């Protein structure tokens, strides 16, 4: 979720607000370090930056100049009456959803609770979010992934954010993936959802060739749940497999040991390219003091067994000796600053034109009622640079809007639902995806889809084969793909519009969205019809009361399981976001895809 942390650092370019305005005024000594490292990086040392500072740092042949060729694209002319009753009602509905989301995020950010936080601080340790704030460039954006991970998944056990924080941010001018254990949540131990979230962060790093920074403070596996954590292919061991293979692919791996690093978790620093450890709090060992005593009878402290002095001076497991958390973060930033420069393969312009219309108007356009229709172009107009949109096949397959735009200077091809998908819509989408792949233009999918058209006429018109063309095109496309659920995501429509199963680089959801194999009402209708036919064959009655008793639990189940909180808790997405922050989210998300060359796309057989 997009959130701000108050910061008074002088004048700022507020054209692009950050996810979090980073807390940098910890103490004078740290500010001196910050001043010094900004000079090292060739940046203006003044602590007053835009949300995308120093965009050219560590980038070869990259400039932030605007691509003026797109300026001739006509802006979308809005037809929205923001003084209408409908607009006001939609706005009120969406604000309720957004405030509920913010309230849940606020509670989650309290981490393991007041007692656990107090104990954590008493050990001289920074909280996980403070550590992230300390390593990311001052004033730069940070996307925190899946804050709702684990939400209501473990009964009375609360696991805020799944016990681990992950995200993408800019460190020493370089876009990086950050993984930070939260030791205030069950000692930072790994639940099944913790493992899944850690692996998802590594997947994002691999897909986009982003350096990984691990801020380690974990007691290892959650032993009571070991059967769901340890042995399978996508369980705990996969973390280290990913570290090894990513390192072999030239994706930097950096570990900062800031707390416990026990048992299998000890391999996180041991398998990293570089490792930092904090004196007094950071420990690395395969077997802790209790296990050592049980096995050998030796009594030894954690620091003596696996502390900074031992691993920096004797074992060589770690490479850099930090005196405290802040020093460790400074060393980590220095390590990232020492990486070779990268060549970005697309254009990113932090000073691009803002949309002509306020992002807050999205509330009044969309609302919370998925049955209400609206022109999705109005949403596009509040996301893209200058509201400029070069529409493709405007008069054909009108229930799928396709066209070209730029987001912070990066050209993107947009596919946005404007109704049910017909054969013509599917063919249009396939054509457009092929065009973008040939030109190596990233794709943005705005999902609000009930599915493909059904009925005899649709089947006779080849909806199955034409829908398959769209699904094939989406599956085979090698350009970066990002999906935002702005409404419903139902059935095969989810597949045709690049759902999670089709490897988009990122998936984000709005709080009004829903995701299911079909809507609850439709599912109840199907099951009701099946029961009626069955009773009819048996010669039995099917009363209205029986029908109601069947329908109600089905509709309730689908409503619960289709809710964005349910989906995000299980990592079916990368986060539920405030609709008005969509442009900013997409800005950093697309920027993170710039590091990796786009390969050629080869399509399979299209049934004609």
Curated annotation (Swiss-Prot):
Q: Which PROSITE patterns match?
A: COA_CT_CTER, COA_CT_NTER
Please name the top-level EC class of this enzyme.
ligase
Which region ranges are annotated with the description Acyl-CoA binding? 388-417
Give the residue ranges for region: Carboxyltransferase: 94-600
The compartments listed are: Mitochondrion matrix
Limits of the CoA carboxyltransferase N-terminal domain:
94-351
Domain CoA carboxyltransferase C-terminal per the UniProt entry, residue ranges: 351-600
Q: Which InterPro entries match?
A: AcCoA_carboxyl_beta (IPR034733), ClpP/crotonase-like_dom_sf (IPR029045), COA_CT_C (IPR011763), COA_CT_N (IPR011762), MCCB/AccD1-like (IPR045190)
Q: Which reaction does it catalyse?
A: 3-methylbut-2-enoyl-CoA + hydrogencarbonate + ATP = 3-methyl-(2E)-glutaconyl-CoA + ADP + phosphate + H(+)
Where is the transit peptide, renumbered to this chain? 1-61
Its cellular-component GO annotations read: cytoplasm; methylcrotonoyl-CoA carboxylase complex; mitochondrial matrix; mitochondrion
Which pathway does the record list?
Amino-acid degradation; L-leucine degradation; (S)-3-hydroxy-3-methylglutaryl-CoA from 3-isovaleryl-CoA: step 2/3
User: What family does the entry list?
Assistant: Belongs to the AccD/PCCB family.
Function text: Carboxyltransferase subunit of the 3-methylcrotonyl-CoA carboxylase, an enzyme that catalyzes the conversion of 3-methylcrotonyl-CoA to 3-methylglutaconyl-CoA, a critical step for leucine and isovaleric acid catabolism.
Q: What is this protein called?
A: Probable methylcrotonoyl-CoA carboxylase beta chain, mitochondrial
Naturally occurring in which organism (per UniProt): Caenorhabditis elegans
Species lineage: Eukaryota, Metazoa, Ecdysozoa, Nematoda, Chromadorea
